[in-house]
Amino acid sequence: GSVLLFGSCSILLNVFQIGYSTILIHCKSSVEIVFPSVGILFICTQAYFLWHHSKDCIQVQHNFTRCGLMLTIATNLLLWLLAVTNDTLHMEIESQLREVEQRFAGKAPSSHPHWCNETTLCTCPNTTICKVFQKGYILLYPFNTEYCLVCSSVLYVMWKNVGRRISHHHTPHTKPKFKLQGVVFGPLLGTSAVIIGACVFMMYQIQATSLVPSRQVFVIYYSYYIVLLPLMSVGAVIGTIIHALEKKELDTLKNPTRSLDVVLLMGAALGQIGMSYFSIVALVATDPRDRLNSLALSYSVLLIFQNITQNVFVIDGLHRQRLTPPGKEEDTKEEQNREANSQRRVSVLELGQEIRKASLSYIQIYSHLSWKRRVLREISFFLVLCNIILWIMPTFGAHPLFENGMERSFYGYSTWFVIVNFGLPLGVFYRMHSVGGLLEVYVTA
């Protein structure tokens, strides 16, 4: 599913890039039109291949298959590295902003001949279609890097499964189904965090992307994170302590998928941790006593701590053995009830009785769950919703680390652009992957 989602966004990104380069064909190379066209073919072919063969354990031509998969992984990593370091369009936009600032200041735009010769001559004209292509390209840019990372992960699992044989006596674990039962406070707190985060995000998008961004919107943005991140960290620490108090044994069986999940969680967290580290260095070296700088500094420190505590909680939960027997009995009872309900027509009176029975059963399940399992479910669901809003905000254009200008002025445009473009896609991928891990912890609690 994620391959198709991010693949579709990557195709749309390439379409915007082709349209943008076509409008500026007088100063753009034809390679900038051919390359995204070939990229669309590659994305479609790869998505089709992964959709139909991602779960196959190939038993023929082992060496040839491994070589092809490793070549495809290397191609995706190269495309990811190219996307991280390619700042052509962003430099053009920066050139336009500098020119506008110079005009407002009453200076001639030709005061920087290097910018005029290379970028100012190749700027987007004041047409709606060009602005649409430009804005769409910038908004969809992180999806392309995520697509490369997701495909590399799936291809690596396929590479590990080449030649793998599953014994006939092996009985695979039946994954428990997701049920919103036994949780009350987690969904309430998580929904509140999502609603407030959506309001902060809309305010940020309106004010921070203007010609002269307001400092107040950055204060609101950082304040939201400074309140939310400690709550998430405390929840993860409490969940880890409950895992330690549980009597569940650790699942020590070899599991390639779980091992990959752990590696991806730890590796993707390095993106946000790295950006936060460089941000801390820049803020401490400049003026940490300034209000906005102190908020950004607190945000970076709390983000590092939250990533570490959440990783410990999720990884510990993934290694706990599942309690299968009660789950199986509940599943069989529910299936029997569904079959019985589908065989008869429900009248208005019966519908009221069914609703009352459902509410009573929900209360019984909530009361029968042990307090440890109940708290784990509440924490897991709360963290799922928090990670969703923290995934949405940077994915759709909230990048305060790049737009507030503090770190950019310290490191320089090109250096900070590479740091952000390296860490931001990993951070977005981390939030998305954390949702999957937390849902598994919730289901198996």
Give the positions of each predicted feature.
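Membrane-proximal N-terminal segments immediately preceding the first transmembrane helix
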Residues: 51, 113-129, 162-177, 197-213, ...
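Membrane-lumen (extracellular) interface motif
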Residues: 14-35, 51-62, 84-94, 197-225, ...
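Extracellular/lumenal N-termini and interhelical loops of multi-pass eukaryotic membrane proteins
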Residues: 76-138, 387-414, 418
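Transmembrane alpha-helices of multi-pass eukaryotic membrane proteins
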Residues: 1-6, 27-42, 62-72, 133-148, ...
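Transmembrane-helix exit/juxtamembrane "anchor" motif
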Residues: 48-55, 151-167, 205, 235-251, ...
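Extended alpha-helical "rod" scaffolds
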Residues: 310-311, 317, 361-364, 372-379, ...
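Membrane-embedded alpha-helical transmembrane segments of multi-pass integral membrane proteins
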Residues: 6-16, 38, 42-52, 75-82, ...
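Non-transmembrane, juxtamembrane loop and terminal tail segments
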Residues: 104, 167-181, 188, 323-374
